[in-house]
Amino acid sequence: MKTLTDEKLTIVGAAGMIGSNMAQTAIMMGLTSNICLYDPYAPGLEGVAEELFHCGFEGVNITFTSDIKDALTGAKYIVNSGGAARKAGMTREDLLKGNAAIAEEFGKNVKAYCPDVKHIVVIFNPADITGLITLLYSGLKPSQVTTLAALDSTRLRSELAKHFGVSMDVVENCRTYGGHGEQMAVYASTAKVDGKPLAGMIGTDALTKEQWAEIQTKVTKGGANIIALRGRSSFQSPSYVSIEMIAAAMGGKPFRWPAGAYVSNGKFDHIMMAWETSITKDGVALKEIKGTPEEEAALEKSYKHLCALRDEVIAMGVLPPISEWHALNQNIK
């Protein structure tokens, strides 16, 4: 089987539903011939490895370990789903304290065991914060760390397709920016449905303002809805989309959706947030975001919410004050 690379890809949290699905997706997409599975829960990890062995895949070497040093040593790409899962009634922010500590330890381990890693995708929630913590403690460049932020945009696409009764293929350029959660900024001005600008349909019989507001609510509550329907948090969609991200970083197909990236541009500073980006072998690069005044105001509101979360982490002592970030990671200006 031809693969994008032969370099080592480590899946952190591989015993979980997201991690195990990421591993299978990476193999089926032909990312690399060298996949390492890591999880501190050794029995579950071995079970995942056995299932993958039983798939009979060809051209791939699958290893597994519960030793983080072994898992990260030599890794050039990492996707990390190794945080606590969100349960019914919890918001992403409820997870903040425990997962912030996990992200700090992970970042330090990256710096110790694989400082030459090329790209990391962090997907455990709240990803805007866990990705930021990982970046700071890993010592990596901002271009080398991204977070999963695309599911809100894919959910917008899905809801619009359902509303208009059309294939998702004709719903284009759906975008949400800012926070990966209930405080996201949902953009209408970028989207088209069957070639028609979405913004021009809002307030008409085709899509009343009330219906548009309902769609936005469904998008912002999409993750909670999956929990209500399935009794557990999403795993198929985050697995697939996060592997699409790391594939782009390996030189594969361009990533089609917004990604969480470190932003510090004078208007939005010292934060990880969903942004319009490109992901290539050179890492993640920021693009310009254009929206209506209302959309830009929503993005600023989302940014302030993320800043409050960031400042809470600083108050917890997980991160130092912003003025000391450069001393922690010299790639942060």
Predicted regions and their residues:
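C-terminal substrate-binding/catalytic lobe of Rossmann-fold NAD(P)-dependent dehydrogenases
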Residues: S138-S143, S153-K333
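Conserved N-terminal Rossmann-fold NAD(P) cofactor-binding segment
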Residues: D6, L31-A75, A84, D311-V318
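N-terminal Rossmann-fold NAD(P) dinucleotide-binding loop
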Residues: G19-S20
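Rossmann-like NAD(P)(H) cofactor-binding subdomain of soluble oxidoreductases
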Residues: T91-E159
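Hydrophobic Val/Ile/Leu positions in short beta-strands of Rossmann-like dinucleotide-binding domains
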Residues: I11-V12, L37
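Conserved glycine-rich cofactor-binding loop
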Residues: A15
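Conserved S-adenosyl-L-methionine
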Residues: M28-N34, G139-P142
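Rossmann-like NAD(P)-binding element
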Residues: C55-H119
